[in-house]
């Protein structure tokens, strides 16, 4: 059953969201967040502005605009962090609000050659480190 708007962490901008992510900026039709758990250095989420669950619910123009946002963030991550590969994931099994995980992968890093862990709970940074990453990503957009 889809998450109702009243319980959606992306729509409500609740405490759970602030524990998981740092807001970076608004994009064309979405918002960009830095995932606080940084086992995959540079991991971000691109979150569609409206409470939509599935890609097929978007019009062609909406879908294309969302994917432009995703591609823009992918280019910024590539520029700032130089990963070997970026994995893209749109699951929304538990949080039914359209969003895309952008997960940089590094040859000698965790999960290279496989699927990334959703939240390994291993690598957290200081507020200053998050702020520095946010500024670098913003500058690369």
Model-derived segments and spans:
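HIT superfamily nucleotide-processing domains
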Residues: 1-141
